[in-house]
C-alpha cells in the first residue's frame, strides 16, 4: 500500500507531518486499548513489596500518559465526526487496513475527503 498525499488540494501537509498523522490515526485502536487498561486497578504495591527502582512519581507519569492518549483519541474522533457519514467507514478502513474504497462514489471523492480528514487530525494534534 502506497501512502501518498494528493497534490491538487488545499489540504497539503509536509510529507513528514502527513505520514506521522497517518500512523497516529492507525494507532487509534491500540490507544483505546491502552486507555481502557490504564483505568483498571493493578494489584501489588503496598508496604511488603520491594521498591521498583523507577525514579519519579509513577502515578503522575501514568496520569500524564493517560491525558496524552485521551487528547489523541479526542482529536481523531473530532475530525472523524466532520466526515460525511456515507464516506466515514470507507475512509476509516482505507487508512486503518489499506482497504479499497467502496464503489458507491468516485475514488476522487473519497481521496478528497480523506485528505481533509488527515489534515484536520494534524491540526487537532497541533502537528502544524
Write out the residue ranges for each language-model feature.
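Helix-turn-helix DNA-binding module
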Residues: 97-109
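N-terminal interaction/assembly modules
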Residues: 1-82, 125-128
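DNA major-groove recognition helices of helix-turn-helix
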Residues: 110-128
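Domain-scale macromolecular recognition modules
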Residues: 89-92, 106, 111-113
Amino acid at each position: 500500500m502506497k501512502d501518498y498525499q494528493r497534490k491538487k488540494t488545499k489540504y497539503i501537509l509536509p510529507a513528514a507531518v502527513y505520514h506521522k498523522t497517518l500512523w497516529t490515526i492507525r494507532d487509534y485502536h491500540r490507544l483505546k486499548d491502552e486507555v481502557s487498561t490504564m483505568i483498571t486497578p493493578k494489584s501489588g504495591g503496598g508496604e511488603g513489596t520491594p521498591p521498583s527502582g523507577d525514579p519519579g512519581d509513577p502515578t503522575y507519569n501514568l496520569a500524564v500518559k493517560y491525558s496524552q492518549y485521551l487528547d489523541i483519541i479526542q482529536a481523531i474522533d473530532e475530525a472523524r465526526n466532520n466526515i460525511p457519514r456515507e464516506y466515514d467507514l470507507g475512509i476509516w478502513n482505507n487508512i486503518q487496513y489499506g482497504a479499497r474504497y467502496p464503489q458507491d462514489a468516485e475514488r476522487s471523492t473519497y481521496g478528497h475527503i480523506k485528505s481533509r480528514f488527515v489534515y484536520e487530525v494534524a491540526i487537532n494534534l497541533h502537528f502544524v
